[in-house]
Amino acid sequence: MGRLNLEHTLQGHKGRIWGVAWHPKGNVFASCGEDKAIRIWSLNGNTWTTKTILSDGHKRTIREIRWSPCGQYLASASFDGTTAIWSKSSGEFECNATLEGHENEVKSVSWSRSGGLLATCSRDKSVWIWEVAGDDEFECAAVLNPHTQDVKRVVWHPTKELLASASYDNTIKMFAEDALDSDWDCVATLSSHTSTVWSIDFDATGERLVSCSDDTSLKIWQAYHPGNDAGVATPDKQTVWKCVCTISGQHSRAIYDVSWCKLTNLIATACGDDGIRIFKETSDSKRDEPTFEQLTAEEGAHDQDVNSVEWNPVVEGQLISCSDDGTIKVWKMTE
């Protein structure tokens, strides 16, 4: 089995820490929390230190931060109903744009692979898609309202302009732009969870999605395209996402976040039972009936709820986590 080794415990935020996000180069990460501040951390020798504190962009808790694929921009989603765009064009990070429109808390933000689109979602049940129109200019391209409850998370597909959202209504929705009229449409609804879907993440290929829920389970979804060799029907020649695996019994409380490593294919979870768990696909797994095993469970990873986990996109096996306990932890997974 594997082992999750704690490398660093970092403090600096006041109160709970909601989100952590690696820079695309893997040598810097950002964190955010209820102190309304963003901290940018870098490795100084063998120690992670706060390089910058951004504290003038939001009036309330910052729920999530995400780096643009080019690494030049950072987007932050806040309970104040706005999304701030930060850039370092002048040498120092500055808030160059504030996106307004959501009626209340913005829960999540995500950049498309090209960096040309940004998605946000909110407690107001809507998903917004923004086009990057030029230097610090963002235009609303779509307001999507297929969810019946609070939308918790938005994540773009790793290679296509396909957006996934997870909601308090127990479903995941997929959105794509119609080639004919340029309207964004809901192209799939993924239903299997029996409670809030807190988070989702694609694998490296984008052919599979993992979801985590208040129902204490993980689900693996497989994309079936028109003409697939498994014989799965695809009405209207639309890709169908089918739940092909449910992973349950390992978590005792809600699973708040999930990260599918693009380098190792390992899945990490952040749980309300203060634990972090790592899952691996078994060697005899089948595409249409995959099986996963728990490699390791770090039961007391934090002293309170673990809110976010994310694998380093460059350094194999490195994981960061953050918690209600006010700490960030850097881990190294060894198999």
Curated annotation (Swiss-Prot):
GO terms for cellular component: cytosolic [4Fe-4S] assembly targeting complex; metallochaperone complex. Gene3D superfamilies: YVTN repeat-like/Quinoprotein amine dehydrogenase. WD repeats lie at residues 12-51, 57-96, 101-140, 146-185, 192-231, 250-289, 301-335. This is Probable cytosolic iron-sulfur protein assembly protein Ciao1. The keyword Repeat applies. Belongs to the WD repeat CIA1 family. Essential component of the cytosolic iron-sulfur (Fe/S) protein assembly machinery. Required for the maturation of extramitochondrial Fe/S proteins. InterPro entries: CIAO1/Cia1 (IPR028608), G-protein_beta_WD-40_rep (IPR020472), WD40/YVTN_repeat-like_dom_sf (IPR015943), WD40_repeat_CS (IPR019775), WD40_repeat_dom_sf (IPR036322), WD40_rpt (IPR001680). SMART domains: WD40 (SM00320). Disulfide bonds: none annotated. Keywords: Repeat, WD repeat. PROSITE patterns: WD_REPEATS_1 (PS00678), WD_REPEATS_2 (PS50082), WD_REPEATS_REGION (PS50294). The gene is Ciao1. It holds the Pfam family WD40. The keyword Repeat applies. GO terms for biological process: iron-sulfur cluster assembly; protein maturation. It comes from Drosophila ananassae.
